[in-house]
Amino acid sequence: MSETLYTGISQLATPRPGPQRGAAMGDLHIIEDAALLVRGGVIQWVGPRAAAPTATHVHDLGGRAVVPGLVDPHTHAVWAGDRLSDWEAKLQGATYEEILARGGGIRSTMRATAAADVAELVALARPRLASLRASGATTTEVKSGYGLDFDAELRMLRAVRELQAEFELRPTLLIHVPPQEGRAEYVVGVCAELIPQVAREGLAEALDVFCEKEAFSVEETRTMFAAAQAHGLRVKLHADQFHAIGGTELACEVGALSVDHLEASGAAQIAALAASETVATILPGVTLHLGLPAAPGRQLIDSGAIVAIGTDLNPGSSPLFSTQLALALAVRLCLLTPAEALSACTVNAAYALGLSDRGSLSAGQRADFLVLNGQDWREVAYTLGGNAVAEVYLAGAQL
């Protein structure tokens, strides 16, 4: 079994293993002049170079900083078409209702995606995922949700499966937009047909629902959650993006992996998350692109919630192709410290996907790590527009 000791690490910065909350999110383990021993894709030892064990191979990283690989827990990286006209119309003052009336908005993405076959969707998604990987994402969640019908949803998930090994993807079935007619029948179909088929084919690890005034109600969400859990899927939620209607409280009640968005969360929702094991995932790219209020990241951490960060990469509200930039934006827009943001983008984001084997540079963890261009780990949160990441390692192998 291959064994490599990585030396020449000016500074190694990592959160402890497992979900971090409150003050622990900012309490990184930082080692100056560090070394890292990897065997069989798993970290065996981390510590000062002067105390390092011997190894078959030694690899000098050239005096640069090392941090864990980033985990992106929320993307919509599979879609067809574009929303450039929508974006320009919005800049000129058009309302979303006006954009919809012109044939734009999310339904234009759904039409284009429904018209694409699996091979086309794979070809479109691959460069997007490559951009996330280059920014430091070693594990990435990808949702369906742009299907006009169940067949289109399944094609999206099959496209994710084609790319799964290449990009270490975690697939999620997203129930995103209610049909314009036959809403009750649609929910029944999701529970009786779509979820069972997805579970049979192993196409997703979790079910996500958009719970919002303009989308699915709390009771509809509860029904779909129950069906998903009965078929062995974990559950997660889009909630509190525009209105707090009870979705966050439901997610905490049923033990959801995460609640994502949270821009409209108030004291009750923050308290519910703080008292739960459900992760609060904030998506600062939406704040930047749409000019909406930011999720209350500072308040969530101060209350004791487990906070993660995602890009929400999608064509309509967050064309953000860098997980690293999402981390940096969370510092500026959601008022996290650099250390908190690193924890949010690593161990906490992994926990939001139900993963405990990555996100920390500790013995027993997967050897997913980033070598930065500079000597100080804070470059990963400081840099805007450039790429602080020089090299990406997945299970100990440089990509």
UniProtKB/Swiss-Prot annotation:
EC number: 3.5.2.7
Region (Disordered), start-end ranges: 1-20
One GO term (biological process): L-histidine catabolic process
Positions bound to N-formimidoyl-L-glutamate: Y146, N314, G316
A Pfam family assignment: Amidohydro_1
InterPro entries in alphabetical order: Amidohydro-rel, HutI, Metal-dep_hydrolase_composite, Metal_Hydrolase
Keywords for this protein: Cytoplasm, Histidine metabolism, Hydrolase, Iron, Metal-binding, Zinc
Residues that bind 4-imidazolone-5-propanoate: R83, Y146, H176, Q241, S317
Biased composition (Polar residues): 1-13
Main location: cytoplasm
Taxonomic superkingdom: Bacteria
Swiss-Prot/TrEMBL catalytic activity: 4-imidazolone-5-propanoate + H2O = N-formimidoyl-L-glutamate
Gene Ontology terms: cellular component: cytoplasm
Cofactor: Zn(2+); Fe(3+)
SUPFAM superfamilies recorded: Composite domain of metallo-dependent hydrolases (SSF51338), Metallo-dependent hydrolases (SSF51556)
Cofactor binding comment, as recorded: Binds 1 zinc or iron ion per subunit.
Pathway(s) the chain acts in: Amino-acid degradation; L-histidine degradation into L-glutamate; N-formimidoyl-L-glutamate from L-histidine: step 3/3
Signal sequence bounds: none
GO MF annotation list: imidazolonepropionase activity; iron ion binding; zinc ion binding
Positions that bind Zn(2+): H74, H76, H238, D312
NCBIfam families, A to Z: hutI
Family label: Belongs to the metallo-dependent hydrolases superfamily. HutI family.
Function: Catalyzes the hydrolytic cleavage of the carbon-nitrogen bond in imidazolone-5-propanoate to yield N-formimidoyl-L-glutamate. It is the third step in the universal histidine degradation pathway.
Protein name: Imidazolonepropionase
Taxonomic lineage of the native organism: Bacteria, Thermotogati, Deinococcota, Deinococci, Deinococcales
Gene name of the encoded protein: hutI
